[in-house]
């Protein structure tokens, strides 16, 4: 039975980058790892309504730099920057380290797989039909320039006694092509019948390697000489 590997993890070091960037010796590694997990969990729970897609963490000496990618940065920053300042103080109290927070706005949230998955999950919690929620999200993504999108919902859909998986796709999703820029998101919907898992894959096109300028110049010169 074939299993789907996380498309982001498969492409790390090829066309995707790490979400955590730091080096540590054996003594500090586990401490930093647990601290990263706690930071991500705290920010996600506190600012879930801001549409947070990704949290990047960098470390240097006693400083922690956090880059938050959000669809609604205004909810995080708050009036006059009060919200982000309060968040920084809470994180400093939790980690006992100097915290620097940077907010990056997601320009097109309809093309961000994590945000799309969370939107579908929130609609399922409001008892909206899973087919309607999935198809609307797919139509919006395709209209805004996605090359392909696939959505899957698993669990006791519509309160059914036997759990099942329903999935729809539109366009192409080349999961085996490593140069394909595929975004992946996962969210859970808490319903009265239990949890439903929501997965979203969005294909945005191929990431082609940059052509070296010197090679292009040599070709131009050879054409002129000919």
From Swiss-Prot:
<dbReference type="InterPro" id="IPR015946">
    <property type="entry name" value="KH_dom-like_a/b"/>
</dbReference>
<dbReference type="GO" id="GO:0006412">
    <property type="term" value="P:translation"/>
</dbReference>
<dbReference type="InterPro" id="IPR004087">
    <property type="entry name" value="KH_dom"/>
</dbReference>
<keyword id="KW-0699">rRNA-binding</keyword>
<dbReference type="GO" id="GO:0003735">
    <property type="term" value="F:structural constituent of ribosome"/>
</dbReference>
<keyword id="KW-0689">Ribosomal protein</keyword>
<feature type="domain" description="KH type-2">
    <location>
        <begin position="39"/>
        <end position="107"/>
    </location>
</feature>
<dbReference type="Pfam" id="PF07650">
    <property type="entry name" value="KH_2"/>
</dbReference>
<dbReference type="InterPro" id="IPR001351">
    <property type="entry name" value="Ribosomal_uS3_C"/>
</dbReference>
<dbReference type="InterPro" id="IPR005704">
    <property type="entry name" value="Ribosomal_uS3_bac-typ"/>
</dbReference>
<dbReference type="GO" id="GO:0003729">
    <property type="term" value="F:mRNA binding"/>
</dbReference>
<keyword id="KW-0694">RNA-binding</keyword>
<dbReference type="InterPro" id="IPR018280">
    <property type="entry name" value="Ribosomal_uS3_CS"/>
</dbReference>
<dbReference type="Pfam" id="PF00189">
    <property type="entry name" value="Ribosomal_S3_C"/>
</dbReference>
<dbReference type="InterPro" id="IPR036419">
    <property type="entry name" value="Ribosomal_S3_C_sf"/>
</dbReference>
<comment type="similarity">
    <text>Belongs to the universal ribosomal protein uS3 family.</text>
</comment>
<keyword id="KW-0687">Ribonucleoprotein</keyword>
<protein>
    <recommendedName>
        <fullName>Small ribosomal subunit protein uS3</fullName>
    </recommendedName>
</protein>
<comment type="function">
    <text>Binds the lower part of the 30S subunit head. Binds mRNA in the 70S ribosome, positioning it for translation.</text>
</comment>
<comment type="subunit">
    <text>Part of the 30S ribosomal subunit. Forms a tight complex with proteins S10 and S14.</text>
</comment>
<dbReference type="GO" id="GO:0019843">
    <property type="term" value="F:rRNA binding"/>
</dbReference>
<dbReference type="InterPro" id="IPR009019">
    <property type="entry name" value="KH_sf_prok-type"/>
</dbReference>
<dbReference type="InterPro" id="IPR004044">
    <property type="entry name" value="KH_dom_type_2"/>
</dbReference>
<dbReference type="GO" id="GO:0022627">
    <property type="term" value="C:cytosolic small ribosomal subunit"/>
</dbReference>
